[in-house]
Amino acid sequence: MDEQRSKGLSAALSQIDKQFGKGAVMRLGDHNAIKDIEVYSTGSLGLDLALGVGGLPRGRVVEIYGPESSGKTTLTLHAIASCQAAGGTAAFIDAEHALDPGYAHKLGVDLENLLISQPDTGEQALEIADMLVRSGAVDLIVIDSVAALTPKAEIEGEMGDSHVGLQARLMSQALRNLTANISRSNTLVIFINQIRMKIGVMYGSPETTTGGNALKFYASVRLDIRRIGAIKKSDEVVGNDTRVKVVKNKVAPPFREAEFAIYYGEGISRLSELVDLGVKFDIVEKSGAWYSYQGHRIGQGKDNARQYLKVHPELAANIEQRIRAAAAGHPLAFAEEVESPQRSAS
């Protein structure tokens, strides 16, 4: 690019940043994302790296959507545990009335200090969220889920009455008020959303999310989470392989992907990720079914390697440190799409 065009582009980018905020336009290969952003870990090392800033950014709206039982709530519970571990206060607005306290505790959530609300209507849920945000004392709020935010008029109406666009209007109005307060209070607000099918779509994906288009626009980060395979131990299914795609990201380049294992009753397996990412970055050697680190065998099969790292946390910490260093030098390492077949845990 010649000097005159380069100056013109720089001036345009500067004006865009001034008018729409820093990060409105970014170079896809730029791994030096916006600095000084406070984040909370997702519980997945690979996803934290794929997000470009090390986790879910504070002071932003995040949407996590996917099919049923794909790991949406698990991801948010890990984020809550991360927030509480850092000394923060978290709230869970359970519009679905389906939170499992026992499972949350297993994932590291401090139940005694977790604020929880089970609202009756969508208006009540979003008003509670707004009041918590405006208090400035809550660091993370999870709303589970957008589909369950039923407008008051629909609840009070007759079964079969038409309520076209009510929920979309509710979300649009609420987000207009929420976003400014979220930015001022530096609160991370996560909306969990479900997938619906559009009727009569001939070309392109028929999938859409509930609640209209407002959340798509206001969200700084949108994560598409999918179950891609079962993890088996002998003949028993003990968990799922999961893929998350960053479909929108206003704090770092988007379209990156991460894959990790979710074990039933345990949540995201960070140790399995260390094995997978270690192999990906040539930090852990794999020969046949055996995994080795610095010439020493750590297990035959991924599950045995995972158990070895569980017993040797200092080794796991060393591998994680090397993975982070390697990922910093490969900004597009998580941009690849890799088909992952069903695998066995042993």
Curated annotation (Swiss-Prot):
Organism, scientific name: Acidithiobacillus ferridurans
Gene3D superfamilies named in the record: P-loop containing nucleotide triphosphate hydrolases
Keyword Signal among record annotations: no
Binding site for ATP: 66-73
Protein task: Can catalyze the hydrolysis of ATP in the presence of single-stranded DNA, the ATP-dependent uptake of single-stranded DNA by duplex DNA, and the ATP-dependent hybridization of homologous single-stranded DNAs. It interacts with LexA causing its activation and leading to its autocatalytic cleavage.
Gene name as annotated: recA
Pfam families from the UniProt entry: RecA, RecA_C
Protein name from the UniProt record: Protein RecA
CDD domains: RecA
